[in-house]
Amino acid sequence: GDIYNYERRLDLEKAAADVSFSCAGVNYTRTVFASHPADCIVMCIESDRPGTINLEARFSRPERAYNGVDRIGKDTIVLHGDLGKHGYDFAVSLKAAADGGSVEQLGEYLVVTGADRVVLYIVADCTYHCKDELEHIMAEKLKTLKESEAAGDLNRQNGNNGSYAVMESEAALWLLKGRMQKVLDRAAGESYNQLLDAHISDYRRLFARVDFSL
């Protein structure tokens, strides 16, 4: 239906942005903030009528500049890619938690149907933050294969071999998924209000240091 009563706001006191609008007689609000304590972006979508939130969420990059989209369970998708030869691998995950209704993963989408409220959690990571751990994993993999001719080729190519690159990419994705899942589990283990309160408290320790007027 048509959208009306559309408003956008940025609250500098809380470091949160929100949007409100009406559609088909239902009033919706969407609030988003980047939480340093939770290490993730949190988005809350609410309405004033039960069971009226239906949405599809996905990641996109220009010209499909990513390697693929995986799933973690039925409520989380992970977009992943790399920056080319000798570059870092990256991944970003999206988790949906719905009060009422249902959440399912269809292809590259998370689909929420008939919810009262939806909280989305966005977490990103790259192998720059876990270089040593990835190197250790690859060293162990090569050690396991060192007796084979293929392993010898991998070592001699020092990362230029296609098989090595594939193996390293798979290891990087596994590592990044695990790191992001820990962050998502911690965030989802708290209520939305707890996450918001912790975010505001952390932010105001910096924001409230200075007060000036013009």
Protein language model features and the residues they cover:
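Aromatic-residue-lined binding/catalytic grooves and analogous aromatic/hydrophobic interfacial grooves
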Residues: 1-214
